[in-house]
Amino acid sequence: MLNSFDAAYHSLCEEVLEIGNTRNDRTNTGTISKFGHQLRFDLSKGFPLLTTKKVSFKLVATELLWFIKGDTNIQYLLKYNNNIWNEWAFENYIKSDEYKGPDMTDFGHRALSDPEFNEQYKEQMKQFKQRILEDDTFAKQFGDLGNVYGKQWRDWVDKDGNHFDQLKTVIEQIKHNPDSRRHIVSAWNPTEIDTMALPPCHTMFQFYVQDGKLSCQLYQRSADIFLGVPFNIASYALLTHLIAKECGLEVGEFVHTFGDAHIYSNHIDAIQTQLARESFNPPTLKINSDKSIFDINYEDLEIVDYESHPAIKAPIAV
């Protein structure tokens, strides 16, 4: 048996495996892909942290709070041992004149096929992370990912140089004009795509208030179904909870709309392992603070009664 959250995710995986198109991609890994899909999660029935594999709530929450703070430097994430964005910062570093170590070209693929190189890569990454944590000057230069999510959410800059806080504006709109159809935040800024380590995959989200409940719909242009989507589901569910609390509302639905939803060819075995599992009851979320959403910390959040199958490792495509 599957709970409704795991069932929705499993249905996406099964459909892409069954009818998806075989495609090449930017990372040269290869994918099975479907264009256009939608999942719906009733947040009143629990918190959608998948149970057919362990998903780290700490990683989900600290990344989301990093976005909310408007931060774009991995130093904050590394303080919480969150390594989600390391590869993109590391890639910028090894291309710089500052880097003097062994050749790390195409480290993502080489580390998977060459054990000796993988040991070199792990050592260079370890040194890189340590310098980010201990050397603020180095972190400022090589830990920053450019104008990624947090910058666009909190400090969008228009053609005239005016700064606009999308997230704060949307929260005020929800409080004072809940029926508006303009409760939208966009991370896709076409004029700044080239300044980002990775263009935004989860591109735009919109809020909807009905009967005292806040719902959120995300449009995700590009979705790594195995590694990314479980995090994205939990992240935007958490965002919905935080903004609902900020606005004095209950939670409604999280609606997840996909553009290119894909399974990487080297994730197929891992997905099939997950699909063979049954699920546990979903956990619940507790927010143990009355702080503003802009001041809340990871320590203020708690996942209650989370039981899951073990995590399943798979390589990330950079």
Swiss-Prot record:
The active site is at C201 (nucleophile). It is an enzyme of class 2 (transferase). GO terms for biological process: dTMP biosynthetic process; dTTP biosynthetic process; methylation. Pfam families: Thymidylat_synt. It catalyses: dUMP + (6R)-5,10-methylene-5,6,7,8-tetrahydrofolate = 7,8-dihydrofolate + dTMP. (6R)-5,10-methylene-5,6,7,8-tetrahydrofolate binds at D224, A317. Gene3D superfamilies: Thymidylate synthase/dCMP hydroxymethylase domain. GO terms for molecular function: thymidylate synthase activity. The keyword Methyltransferase applies. CDD domains: TS_Pyrimidine_HMase. SUPFAM superfamilies: Thymidylate synthase/dCMP hydroxymethylase. Its main location: cytoplasm. GO terms for cellular component: cytosol. DUMP binds at R26, R181, R182, R221, S222, A223, D224, N232, H262, I263, Y264. It comes from the Bacteria. Its EC number is 2.1.1.45. It is found in: Cytoplasm. Keywords: Cytoplasm, Methyltransferase, Nucleotide biosynthesis, Transferase. Pathway: Pyrimidine metabolism; dTTP biosynthesis. Homodimer. Belongs to the thymidylate synthase family. Bacterial-type ThyA subfamily. PANTHER family: THYMIDYLATE SYNTHASE (PTHR11548:SF9), THYMIDYLATE SYNTHASE 1 (PTHR11548). HAMAP family: Thymidy_synth_bact (MF_00008). Catalyzes the reductive methylation of 2'-deoxyuridine-5'-monophosphate (dUMP) to 2'-deoxythymidine-5'-monophosphate (dTMP) while utilizing 5,10-methylenetetrahydrofolate (mTHF) as the methyl donor and reductant in the reaction, yielding dihydrofolate (DHF) as a by-product. This enzymatic reaction provides an intracellular de novo source of dTMP, an essential precursor for DNA biosynthesis. This is Thymidylate synthase.
